[in-house]
UniProtKB/Swiss-Prot annotation:
It comes from Methylocella silvestris (strain DSM 15510 / CIP 108128 / LMG 27833 / NCIMB 13906 / BL2). Binds 1 pyruvoyl group covalently per subunit. GO terms for cellular component: cytosol. The active site is at S24, Y57. NCBIfam families: panD. The lineage of its organism: Bacteria, Pseudomonadati, Pseudomonadota, Alphaproteobacteria, Hyphomicrobiales. Keywords: Autocatalytic cleavage, Cytoplasm, Decarboxylase, Lyase, Pantothenate biosynthesis, Pyruvate, Schiff base, Zymogen. It comes from the Bacteria. The gene is panD. This is Aspartate 1-decarboxylase. It catalyses: L-aspartate + H(+) = beta-alanine + CO2. The modification Pyruvic acid (Ser) is found at S24. Its EC number is 4.1.1.11. Substrate binds at T56, G72, A73, A74.
């Protein structure tokens, strides 16, 4: 089994840090559902401001709140306004990778969803892996892709 990307919240901003809590990250259930992230699921958090990388579990906040609250020890690594990448994982046999299509959500400064993307791995005629980023409208985007900036795949 290999650890692969299950879903991603890219560029979501910390709305609060709560040191006096038992731990975890509190997220808007609507964001979690759209990215396929479950309550109590362990996620990796990468802070784009500080470079800190931590692992914690998800608890659900109020639906529609757009919250991203770091709790307990995690609050020491992320401050309100910090931009994060939150990534869940799945474990699959490598042969199953072409069946995987993790959701990737990008966010504006107010934690509104800007883009709903999916990662796609296929094999070409020679059996080589091909990686793509697929937009909600089905457009294939060229990696690397800057958040919020579409680049069409070269023909």
């Amino acid at each position: 089994m290999r650890k692969l990307v299950g879903g991603k919240l890219h560029g979501i901003r910390v709305t609060e840090s709560n040191l006096e809590y038992h731990g975890s990250i509190t997220l808007d259930p609507a964001h979690c559902e759209a990215a396929g992230i479950l309550p109590l699921e362990f996620v990796e958090i990468w802070n784009k401001n500080s470079g800190a990388r931590i692992t914690t579990y998800v608890i659900l906040g109020q639906r529609g709140s757009r919250c991203c609250v770091l709790n307990g020890a995690a609050a020491r690594t992320c401050q309100p306004g910090d931009e994060l990448i939150i990534c869940s994982s799945v474990y699959l046999d490598g042969a199953e990778i072409t069946n995987l299509s993790p959701a990737v959500l990008t966010f504006d400064a107010n934690n509104n969803i800007v883009e709903r993307l999916h990662y796609s791995v296929t094999r070409d005629g020679a059996g080589h892996y091909q990686f793509g980023i697929v937009a909600e409208d089905g457009e294939i985007l060229q990696p690397p892709l800057k958040s919020g900036m579409r680049q069409k795949r070269a023909s």
